[in-house]
């Protein structure tokens, strides 16, 4: 539980202060200001412990948000709450800065009354909060529109009921559902082409514009394994092996019915309205690496070095990768670079000690290469200290999920309103992007 919550500006002045427990005093305000905000050296850790008191902080622009506690709390829970608190404020009055916090301090205190109860986080969904807290960023002199008994009953049932993330009575002229599978590939490969570490961090992002109170359901691969638990969906071992995905860990939105996921390996949920993140997951097995980077470095003499980098695409020829960028490090004593590339454009950036090679598009099962002749300056200091070659890094975007995650079906059920699954316009998109994608040279 959280003992106190404070919001500071960049000078360390307190903009918002709320103490929830007696074991936290106003002295905590000064302790954080002196030891973190006004510290001589930048404090990199988001958690600071002083006098048996823990300070958890995040920074948005020029605003510091700090949660204080003397209890042994779950750090992940505190940071998740701080993130959602900041997102909630942004959803009400836009950019989170000192001026907006001062202009909306009444609204912020009203939000704190709803999202924290005696230090325990409660409802932090902006969509739900906006049903019973004014949406105006700054309070006006005009009295708010009174809430009827019927509206009050609807608000109460939404906040305390089982479906607190969606209000009733939503109507759209056209029912649409968008699903994006977005994955980030992280790779570290040595000079011989051996994978030292690789993992995929993925998420399922959705946009729902559906009328009424529908139930959505989508199925993923024929076979999925989560933390050693196999959920078979096919009796054919060959088919299951081709479609299998081993997920190390995953996290779902509160709307997902976990019991059905355990039994049917299908995700069933009543969706929130608008944009939301339905699922996060991580996998380290059977990753399809979109690209192979092969660097070759040859030291011709003390004053010259030759570099050749080959990029090979490892996916279907019908697919097209975009936004390719390869960064090739150069020694700090580089005086000049001559470049020859088969495709795209390459440029030497002296300020970054790197050659940046950009390719707009590249089809699958293709390869391209770049050659560079690097001229070096002869300096005693550089010759004495050997240059440790940084890895070659790569950025890209591909239209498939490198983990192999597939959406088998996506259905919508709404028994009360007069529309069926066939009346809903549905879109499914796969996006694979580079995280930290490096090859040692």
UniProtKB/Swiss-Prot annotation:
It is found in: Cell membrane; Membrane, Coated pit. Brain, heart, lung, liver, testis and spleen. Pfam families: Adap_comp_sub, Clat_adaptor_s. It comes from the Eukaryota. Residues 174-440 form the MHD domain. CDD domains: AP-2_Mu2_Cterm, AP2_Mu_N. PROSITE patterns: CLAT_ADAPTOR_M_1, CLAT_ADAPTOR_M_2, MHD. GO terms for biological process: body morphogenesis; clathrin-dependent endocytosis; intracellular protein transport; necroptotic process; positive regulation of Wnt protein secretion; protein localization to non-motile cilium; receptor-mediated endocytosis; regulation of neurogenesis. Keywords: Cell membrane, Coated pit, Endocytosis, Membrane, Protein transport, Transport. One of its GO terms (molecular function) is clathrin adaptor activity. InterPro entries: Adaptor_comp_med_subunit (IPR050431), AP2_Mu_C_sf (IPR036168), AP2_Mu_N (IPR043532), AP_mu_sigma_su (IPR022775), Clathrin_mu (IPR001392), Clathrin_mu_CS (IPR018240), Longin-like_dom_sf (IPR011012), MHD (IPR028565). Component of the adapter complexes which link clathrin to receptors in coated vesicles. Clathrin-associated protein complexes are believed to interact with the cytoplasmic tails of membrane proteins, leading to their selection and concentration. AP50 is a subunit of the plasma membrane adapter. Essential wnt/egl-20 signaling protein that functions in wnt/egl-20-producing cells. Required for the AP-2 complex-mediated endocytosis of membrane proteins including wntless homolog mig-14 in egl-20-producing cells. Belongs to the adapter complexes medium subunit family. PANTHER family: AP COMPLEX SUBUNIT MU. Adapter protein complex 2 (AP-2) is a heterotetramer composed of two large adaptins (alpha-type subunit and beta-type subunits), a medium adaptin (mu-type subunit AP50) and a small adaptin (sigma-type subunit AP17). This is AP-2 complex subunit mu. It comes from Caenorhabditis elegans.
